[in-house]
Swiss-Prot record:
It comes from the Bacteria. The keyword Protein biosynthesis does not apply. It comes from Nitrobacter hamburgensis (strain DSM 10229 / NCIMB 13809 / X14). One of its GO terms (biological process) is division septum assembly. Pfam families: MMR_HSR1 (PF01926). Its cofactor is Mg(2+). This is Probable GTP-binding protein EngB. Residues 37-214 form the EngB-type G domain. PANTHER family: ENGB-TYPE G DOMAIN-CONTAINING PROTEIN, MSS1/TRME-RELATED GTP-BINDING PROTEIN. GTP binds at residues 45-52, 72-76, 92-95, 159-162, 193-195. One of its GO terms (cellular component) is cytosol. Necessary for normal cell division and for the maintenance of normal septation. The gene is engB. Belongs to the TRAFAC class TrmE-Era-EngA-EngB-Septin-like GTPase superfamily. EngB GTPase family. InterPro entries: G_ENGB_dom, GTP-bd, GTP-bd_ribosome_bio_YsxC, P-loop_NTPase.
Length: 217
């Protein structure tokens, strides 16, 4: 049952993402990051977990974030800026866990991710995307540990829910909640989404609207 407060947050989230969102910056290195401004929310996850697709679903713009079938294609921190009165940025982080890229490039991308997480005061939260079909892998655990150690708030978003049976999805969600209890920087609520069907997208928008509102007070 949706309460009045829930409905209000969902409407706030809808309005936030109904505004004009646009690409503003691409950073291949920590030295080329844009100046910190407003509230930043980042999306992290394994290669092809659906980060770009979810950003497109959130904003309702199918081509805002470029998607690729090639793992590891996103090699930079990609910044998108929302409506001017919102003072919010989304950050599409390089996918991790790709096996086909050269080791030197993997090391470079990994270093960029870690340095960004450790030194970005404007970063309100990292949404760590997990493929619902596979659950949390060792490489995801390593990122969660990095976030814990750097005291960066993060929340798990399970993606591609349309490709998993309902019973399996419920089990995966509960197993994820249980695992997160061991991680001090993790927000306890697990969000379940499908960029293809739109399932869970209004709830993610609402969660982000609440978070952004708290940081702008």
């Amino acid at each position: 049952m949706t309460t009045g407060a829930d409905a209000d947050l969902i409407e706030r989230g809808r309005k936030l993402f109904a505004g004009d969102w646009q690409f503003i910056w691409a950073s291949p290195s920590i030295e080329t990051l844009p100046p910190m401004a407003g509230v930043e929310v980042a999306f992290a996850g394994r290669s092809n977990v659906g980060k770009s697709s979810l950003i497109n679903a959130l904003t309702g713009r199918g081509t805002l974030a470029r998607t690729s079938r090639t793992p590891g294609r996103t090699q930079e921190l990609i910044f998108f800026e929302g409506p001017k009165d919102a003072d919010v940025r989304l950050v599409d982080m390089p996918g991790y866990g790709f096996a086909s890229a050269p080791k030197a490039r993997i090391a470079s991308w990994t270093s960029l991710i870690h340095k960004f997480l450790l030194g970005r005061a404007s970063l309100a939260r990292v949404y760590v995307l997990i493929d619902s079909r596979h659950g949390i892998k060792d490489i995801d655990q390593a990122i969660l540990t990095t976030l814990d150690r750097s005291a960066v708030s993060y929340q798990i978003v399970l993606t591609k829910a349309d490709e998993v049976k309902a019973t399996e999805m419920a089990e995966r969600t509960e197993a994820t909640r249980t695992l997160l209890a061991k991680h001090p920087a993790a927000f306890p609520d697990v969000l379940v989404t499908s960029s293809r069907t739109g399932y869970g997208v209004p709830e993610l928008r609402a969660a982000m609207a609440r978070l952004i509102g708290e940081h702008q007070r």
